């Protein structure tokens, strides 16, 4: 990765909070660089496979804490935000095919 001394702000961590911060700062005209150690950004908002064939966001239950102002300001629906209501809070698949 090339280094640059032209950044106004360096944000360590590309989790959802770091990305929101970066978006607001960039909107003011600042040059922002975000560094993330993982191969993808999003932090707790990332959807990952926790069991073969089963994908979930590890912190999807916190979506209710997402400030509506942030959703509007960043036009998240225009960028693919879709909140899906689940009929159950938890799901546990069992090795014998049953679940609860």
Task: Show the residue positions of the predicted features.
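N-terminal glycine-rich phosphate/pyrophosphate-binding loop and immediately adjacent elements
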Residues: 3-100
């Amino acid at each position: 990765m090339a280094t640059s001394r032209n950044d106004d702000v360096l944000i360590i961590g590309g989790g959802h909070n770091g990305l929101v911060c970066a978006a607001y700062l960039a909107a003011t005209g600042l040059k922002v660089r975000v560094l993330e150690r993982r191969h993808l950004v999003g932090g707790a908002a990332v959807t990952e496979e926790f069991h073969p064939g089963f994908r979930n966001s590890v912190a999807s239950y916190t979506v209710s804490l997402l400030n509506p102002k942030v959703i509007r300001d960043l036009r998240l629906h225009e960028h693919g935000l879709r909140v899906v209501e689940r009929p159950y809070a938890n799901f546990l698949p069992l090795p014998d095919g049953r679940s609860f």
